[in-house]
Amino acid sequence: MTVTRPRAERGAFPPGTEHYGRSLLGAPLIWFPAPAASRESGLILAGTHGDENSSVVTLSCALRTLTPSLRRHHVVLCVNPDGCQLGLRANANGVDLNRNFPAANWKEGETVYRWNSAAEERDVVLLTGDKPGSEPETQALCQLIHRIQPAWVVSFHDPLACIEDPRHSELGEWLAQAFELPLVTSVGYETPGSFGSWCADLNLHCITAEFPPISSDEASEKYLFAMANLLRWHPKDAIRPS
């Protein structure tokens, strides 16, 4: 069996998508169950921040490139479809979803981020939500994870150019080699109410994969086969990083 589909067939997704909820503005929240699912299946996420689209495009390309029957891991291509549609980091309520998860360290009030990679200050204000897990996108993702019980999660972001894995695991090392990014145990600042914090409360292994500042076009060329190999990764198979 060939590992990849012919390029001419990659313009559309293979069948098999499901809905796990709706966004604040009513967009369907879509996930891609793994055709070759097992107890060892993980979950791969992108699009938590709507202004971070290079990993969304690359993950989409990988989903359409890999032969579907080889995919071992579940995918949520876009956690925040309203933000992606509007080009916002936040959801349509102005809430940073990565500060809204019902983690023990959630903090009420405001959070700040950098306008872009050239900005020196974190001075753009977003909200963390009225309460932990207040947003429909957050609630739906938490429910999905409780339902499918993934063995691990890899959450894609940008532009910090690193693989953050507090456990320094075999998968973390593989990701660092495959994507040619440094492996770190922390991004260096507090992230109260983040998805990773919530996963830590559940003892669910979460790795945050941060692309560098990169265009979608370049990312889909540079990282396509690393992403496709992640979709079928298994430690026993010793899949080469690239």
UniProtKB/Swiss-Prot annotation:
Textual note on the cofactor: Binds 1 zinc ion per subunit.
Gene Ontology BP terms: cell wall macromolecule catabolic process; cell wall organization; peptidoglycan catabolic process; proteolysis
Gene Ontology terms, MF aspect: amidase activity; murein tripeptide carboxypeptidase activity; zinc ion binding
Keyword Phosphoprotein: no
Keywords from the UniProt entry: Carboxypeptidase, Cell wall biogenesis/degradation, Cytoplasm, Hydrolase, Metal-binding, Metalloprotease, Protease, Zinc
Active site (record annotation): E210
EC numbers for this chain: 3.4.17.-
Pathway it works in: Cell wall degradation; peptidoglycan degradation
Cofactor(s) this protein requires: Zn(2+)
Location relative to the cell: Cytoplasm
Catalysed reactions, semicolon-separated: L-alanyl-gamma-D-glutamyl-meso-2,6-diaminopimelate + H2O = L-alanyl-D-glutamate + meso-2,6-diaminopimelate
Main location: cytoplasm
Domain Peptidase M14 stretches: 1-234
Membership in a protein family: Belongs to the peptidase M14 family.
Function (record text): Involved in muropeptide degradation. Catalyzes the hydrolysis of the gamma-D-glutamyl-diaminopimelic acid (gamma-D-Glu-Dap) amide bond in the murein tripeptide L-alanyl-gamma-D-glutamyl-meso-diaminopimelic acid, leading to the formation of L-Ala-gamma-D-Glu and Dap.
Alphabetized HAMAP family for the sequence: MpaA_carboxypeptidase
Protein name: Murein peptide amidase A
Native organism: Escherichia coli O157:H7
